[in-house]
Structures are given as structure tokens and as C-alpha cells.
Amino acid sequence: MTTTTTQRDLPKPEFTDAEAGAREFPDSNARRFSYYTPQKRKQSHYEDVTVEVQPDPRHYLSQGWLYGFSDGRGGYPLDWTALKAWGSDRPEPERFPGSGGRGYDWPATGWHEFRDPNEEWELTLYRYNANVVRQINANIDTARETKAFEQWNRNWVTFVERNIGAWMHVEHGLGLYLFANANRRAPTNMHNNAISVNSMHRIRTAQDLALYNLTLSEEIESFDGAAHIEAWNSDPAWQGVRKTAEQLTGIDDWCEAIFAANVVFEPLVGELFRSHLVQQAAPGNGDFITPTIVGAGEYDFAQRDLRYTIAMFELLTNDREFADHNKAILDQWLAVWVPRAISASRALLPLWSQPDFKPPRFEDGLDRAKSRFGGILTQLSLAEPKELTQ
């Protein structure tokens, strides 16, 4: 018996030249892009993967924002901060049939001129954080093998279980509720990347301290891994820091949040605690491990997070259209946050007397912190507020 197979008549593919890569046009085979002006003579890899990834209907995106909020506004409104960059007051171009959909020439507003000097994007974040965690783990493993934790005296164990753990709450709160929130509200992808990396530095540091707390609970028999909760909730020395940190997380203006945290709080409170207390007192009390954990977070701020912050606000204080406006706003923020930071710093004074081996005097450390803070303000062309003398 013979069976016959019926030939099926399938539609033949028709190429319409609508598929990606079908058309040839000037620069269609280029490996670099020309829709923006690079900061330097040549475009960098960082700029190619960052600039205009977040669109702006003032430049292109002629159909407007693809999504919006319940109040009718779409995308990333520029009034989410009181600061302004040149071009901010220009309305979005009106698009209508026959207009050609043309927006303002690049960069449309001064916000797009910001470049993170750290050139942060996804790859750099993963690589950097992985290297830090790898080094911290190696340090802790070495300390375990050499029984280094046995060299700690009792007072230092108490100091670490209460105060290093308490600082973990600061890192977690600011990372998750201040920087992550500010990242979503910033108007360009260059800002988004820099701020989100700042957020992840904070969250990673909080995680480092939490895991370190668990390690110490295993390695030191008398170590109370829950003592930091009581210190954070009720120790008078920490209530100023706690109050200020919680106030920081409640800031609505994303520029104010970054400015208050990185320009005011960190130099006057964070570096005072980490550099002028923990790093100074730990070696004399037999602890050479804690400074490596705390120092990783200190390096994040001093060498990376502060660097992009200065670049971001320096651009605004020298803006060709709104420099005076921005300086006036920043002076107002300084008048609010400097007294709070100084008050939080002074509340930490009792911690300086707790270790057996004492760090340099509290007032000396605070003077250095104030000097550092003044240097940052000078870079931003801002005057020191009178509140700094408190």
C-alpha cells in the first residue's frame, strides 16, 4: 500500500527592511555613538553605556514620557529638587503633526552635563563590591586561623558589640531609604548610576557589619550579638545619630538628601566615628580586624562617594544660569543640617572614654572633622555656616 504526502503550502518569508540592522545609513556600522557630546575629546566607554540611557523629552522622545503618575506628571519631573540646572525652566517642546518632533539640541538642560568621575555603571559596581567582600572574607578567615580575636580585652569586646553594630543601622537606613530613593528621583542616568552605587556601598557595608557581628558571636564566647539593638534604641550616646539619620531618610528633595548625607553628615559624624574613634582605638586594644571592615566603608565614602558628590554639586554651584539660586538653597540646607550633625557628633562623646586604650581627644577629632568639612565647602564655592562653631 502506497501513502502519499501532501505538500504543504507555507508562506514564504518576505523581508521588509524593518528588521534591526537591515538599513544602511551614515554611522550604521559605527562602534561609537554621536547623539551626545563627550566630556573630553573622545567618548569613553562609561559615556557610551550611560549617557541618555534615561531619555529626556526635551531632547528627544517626541511622544513624551511613556509612563506617568497619578497626578498626571510623567517620568522624572525636574521639580523633584529645588536646585536647578541651566535650561530647567524651558518648557518641553510642543510636538504636533508637521512639527517634525524636534526637541532642544543636546544636552537640552545642564543636568545632562554631569559625569561621574568614578565612571560607575553596572559592571564596575559588581566588580568593585565583589573585590571588597572577597578581601574582607580573607581578613576574617586569617583572623580565625591565627586566633586573633583572643587578643581583645573585655572592654573592647563590649565596645564593638554595642557601637560597631549600632553604626550598622546607620548604613542600612541611609543606603536603603535615602540613597535608593534619591536614585529613582534623579533626572539623568549619570546621576542614577552614581547614586545607586552609593546606595549599594552603604547596603554592602551594613551587610559586612551584620556578618561580622555573627562571626564575633561564634568566635568570642562572651560576645553579645544583640547588644547593638539596645544601644541603637536607648543608649543616649546614639540617640543624636539615630534622630539625625531618621530625619535624613525623611527628606523629599533628592538633591537635599545627597547633600545632607554626603556633604554634612558623613564628614561631621561618619568620619568622626570611623576615622577618629574606631580606627584610632582598635589597634591599641588588640583589634586589627575591625579597622579593615570599617575601613572598607570609609574608603567607599572618602574615595568614591564624596568624589561624585563634589562633581555633581560643583556643576550646580557654577551653573551658568542658576549658580546664585543654587548657592542660596545650599546655604539654607547647611543652616538646617549642620546644627543637627554637630549635635549628633557631640552626643557621641562618651564613646571616647570606653576603650582601655584611648583614642586621641574627642575635641581634636571633631576639629579635624570640621576642617575636612570646611575644605569640602571650599571646593563647592560655599561659605562655612556660622552653625559650625557650635
For each predicted feature, which ranges?
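Alpha-helical scaffold segments in carbohydrate-active enzymes
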Residues: 194-215, 268, 297-312, 340
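Long, hydrophobic, well-ordered secondary-structure blocks that form the structural core
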Residues: 150-233
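Alpha-helical bundle segments that constitute or directly flank the non-heme di-iron/ferroxidase center
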Residues: 66-68, 154-186, 252-280
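Inter-helical turn/loop segments and adjacent helix faces that build the functional surface
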Residues: 179-194, 214-221, 248-257, 275-297, ...
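Acidic/His metal-coordination segments adjacent to aromatic residues that form catalytic metal sites
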Residues: 142-163, 223-263, 320-328
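Alpha-helical scaffold segments that form or flank carboxylate-/histidine-based iron centers
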Residues: 106, 110-113, 159-163, 187-203, ...
